[in-house]
């Protein structure tokens, strides 16, 4: 990619016109990651990227993009806003490399769906996917920056907190296929209602060039014009005969004949698998390859990982994030389990004025489960007056309590929003000897 193209797309001005015939390899916002021939973009956020320009040049940067007028002996593009510039460059990369892009949004299940789609598509295509949860106005461009010329497919998450954010991302990368996993209560504090969350998620169609795939069993999505999957008869791809455990599920779908599919996911995540299957079929993946891929799928770290510790405890490590919908799903799995259960639950964040209302629904979910001890963590959970529940401020207090307990042969659920860092409790159980 040449400097003139970058200059045009960012609508910037050249400060230093040395060697404008250079070809840029990659775009980076971390000066430590710069290699020879890369472009360093000085973002201004929690830290000011302009402070690290000298390090970027030392590491081999061939071009820098800045929003402050600085003079270095290197080609430099001055723009009004480097945060907006990375979006413009992401659009340029999209047009230059032109992979088929699959964009995914939804209240819950974005990462699981992305991983499932990637697992299926890589059986036939060279694929690229979002790293971690790179799904906002910074993360999506970073995902595009990592694209290679020979990537045929890019599977990209899109998250949001407010109206307009997904519209911006969709127009930036103009997806060929879009996915909405479901409509729940995540970010309801900012948007005010599920109806508004639906409107915000549907912004993914603003830049969409092809079909929309949705969970047709979701009551907010079933009336949308889309390719649908689920268990209801209104769907284009219909699953049936579902059997499941904590670690896996088996179900059937009908194509030219019935096919049985096994995937290492519990029942409340099968809607994500069905969307992935539907997209795989749309993109001409043989059903036998889809079945093989799903049978070998392993869930993402801290998302419904089933672990064993030295005391024969089974740990459900689901502490990457939480919502009322995902918590309901995992607690439903435990209703018929006879094991002694320890439910370690932390706050659900980003609920705004709806926080008390949603947290107050949790006791009704807990009432359905027998043989349980309940540990509630965080300022919102402390407001829940649940019978015999133990409350702690944070994971550190919780671990101090657990050190005094003898816990063996139990089924332990650990779940909360990301900021509570409950993976530290998981690590405590797995590494008792080091505490």
Predicted regions and their residues:
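N-terminal leader/targeting and accessory segments in enzymes
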Residues: 1-88, 240-242, 285, 335-339, ...
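Phosphate-binding loop of NTP-binding sites
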Residues: 4-10, 85-212, 216, 220-225, ...
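Acidic, Mg2+-coordinating active-site environments of NTP-dependent enzymes
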Residues: 66-74, 177-315, 336-339, 364-373, ...
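ATP-dependent carboxylate/acyl-activation modules
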Residues: 104, 110, 301-303, 419
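Glycine-rich phosphate/pyrophosphate-binding beta-alpha loops
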Residues: 302, 319-329
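Short glycine-rich anion-binding loops that position phosphate/pyrophosphate groups of nucleotides
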Residues: 45-46, 160-163, 184-186, 217-219, ...
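Residue-level signal for inorganic ion chemistry
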Residues: 6, 38, 56, 89, ...
């Amino acid at each position: 990619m040449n400097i003139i193209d970058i200059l045009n797309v960012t609508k910037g001005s050249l400060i230093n016109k040395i060697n404008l015939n250079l070809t840029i390899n990659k775009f980076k916002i971390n000066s430590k990651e710069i290699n020879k021939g890369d472009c360093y973009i000085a973002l201004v956020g929690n830290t000011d990227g302009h402070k690290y320009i000298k390090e970027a040049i030392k590491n081999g940067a061939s071009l820098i993009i800045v929003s402050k007028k600085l003079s270095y002996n290197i080609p430099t593009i001055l723009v009004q806003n480097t945060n907006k510039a990375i979006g413009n460059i992401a659009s340029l990369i999209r047009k230059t490399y032109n992979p088929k892009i699959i964009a995914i949004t939804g209240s819950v299940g974005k990462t699981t769906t992305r991983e499932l789609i990637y697992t299926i598509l890589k059986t036939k295509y060279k694929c690229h996917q979002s790293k971690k949860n790179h799904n906002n106005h910074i993360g999506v461009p970073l995902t595009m920056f990592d694209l290679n010329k020979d990537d045929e497919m890019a599977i990209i998450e899109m998250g949001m907190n407010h109206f307009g954010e997904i519209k911006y991302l969709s127009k930036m990368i103009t997806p060929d296929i879009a996915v909405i996993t479901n409509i729940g209560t995540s970010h309801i504090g900012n948007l005010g209602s599920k109806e508004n969350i639906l409107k915000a998620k549907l912004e993914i169609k603003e830049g969409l060039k092809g079909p929309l795939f949705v969970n047709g069993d979701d009551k907010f999505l079933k009336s949308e014009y889309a390719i649908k999957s689920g268990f209801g008869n209104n769907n284009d791809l219909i699953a049936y005969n579902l059997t499941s455990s904590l670690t896996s599920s088996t179900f059937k779908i009908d194509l030219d004949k019935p096919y049985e599919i096994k995937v290492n996911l519990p029942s409340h995540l099968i809607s994500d698998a069905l969307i992935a299957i539907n997209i795989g079929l749309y993109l001409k993946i043989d059903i036998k390859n889809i079945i093989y891929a799903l049978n070998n799928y392993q869930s993402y770290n801290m998302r419904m990982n089933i672990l064993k510790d030295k005391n024969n405890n089974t740990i459900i490590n689901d502490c990457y994030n939480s919502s009322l919908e995902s918590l309901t799903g995992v607690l439903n799995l435990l209703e018929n389990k006879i094991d002694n259960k320890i439910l370690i639950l932390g706050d659900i964040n980003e609920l705004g004025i709806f926080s008390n209302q949603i947290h107050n629904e949790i006791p009704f979910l807990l009432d359905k489960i027998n043989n349980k001890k309940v540990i509630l963590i965080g300022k919102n959970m402390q407001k829940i007056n649940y019978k015999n529940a133990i409350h702690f401020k944070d994971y550190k207090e919780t671990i101090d309590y657990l050190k005094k307990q003898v816990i063996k042969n139990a089924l332990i659920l650990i779940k909360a929003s990301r900021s509570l860092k409950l993976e530290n409790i998981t690590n405590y159980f797995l590494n008792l000897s080091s505490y």
